Amino acid sequence: MNYLNIYNLLIEKGLNRGNDKSLLTYYTETHHIIPRCMGGTDDKTNLVLLTPEEHFTAHLLLFKIYRLPKLALAIRMMCYSSDGTRLNNKMYGWIKTAVSSSISESMKEFWKDDDNKKYMSNARRNAGKPIYQYDLNGNFIRKYRCITDAAEDMSYSCSTSIKQCVDGKRKTAGGFQWKYYYSDNIGKPSRMSNATKQKMSKSKRGITQKRNVPVFQYDTTGKLLRVFPRIKDAAVSVKGCMSNIKKCISGKSKIAYGYVWAYS
């Protein structure tokens, strides 16, 4: 079978439709005709709009033609759902189109609600609100301009954890207490019950096993850059959150901090 001929016909079909998304009434994705891992650029002449099914098929054809590991990685990123279920091109297309449409409609409804507008307005204000760092004995350490600054300073921590702490949803984050207000001493965090401690211990054991699995870091072309002994080391290297890297590994996002991540 002449895979190159089939690929060229598929690309020609997409080019004949045009590359103006505003003129198309259905969901499409941008595809690099010559893959970036093979020297392709982001120039408009190297781009074509394809349906999700066509996009998936195009990557399969490229791999069948050239048999490059980097092309295989691109397919791997496309053909697995977040729970590890393998998808064929029809299922992939249906899911991508359905999700895109669903998100678009839900966001339209979201912004119609005055309570949601108020919530987002408050969230934006809190994002730039000063926060105060305390040790576990309640002693004041320092003030940060906002949660983002605190998270960047503590490369092993995460802004989400700090946000949960200042909102009262958790006691500590990164080995510290965090508040929206200043005090010389806020006291020690309240003690947890034995039942809660046991529950957290069981949860941490499971998390630790997953975190000790080697993590592979790739650039966006599929080139292997580094191998980290565990996910925590990977997060520290990019001054990011383990949760964002895990989302990339599980397929919930394609990249995290400018890289592709995988367990193998």
Curated annotation (Swiss-Prot):
For the keyword Nuclease, the answer is yes
In what residue span(s) does the HNH domain sit?
25-50
Q: Which GO terms describe its molecular function?
A: endonuclease activity; nucleic acid binding; zinc ion binding
Recite the UniProt keywords alphabetically: Endonuclease, Hydrolase, Nuclease
Organism superkingdom: Viruses
Which Pfam families does the protein's record reference?
HNH, NUMOD1
**UniProt xrefs under CDD domains:** HNHc
Q: InterPro entries per the record?
A: HNH (IPR002711), HNH_nuc (IPR003615), Intron_nuc_1_rpt (IPR003647), NUMOD1 (IPR010896), WH-like_DNA-bd_sf (IPR036388)
User: Has UniProt tagged this entry with the keyword Nuclease?
Assistant: yes
Entry's family note: To phage T4 mobC and mobD.
Protein name per its UniProtKB record: Probable mobile endonuclease B
Q: What organism, scientifically named, is this protein from?
A: Enterobacteria phage T4
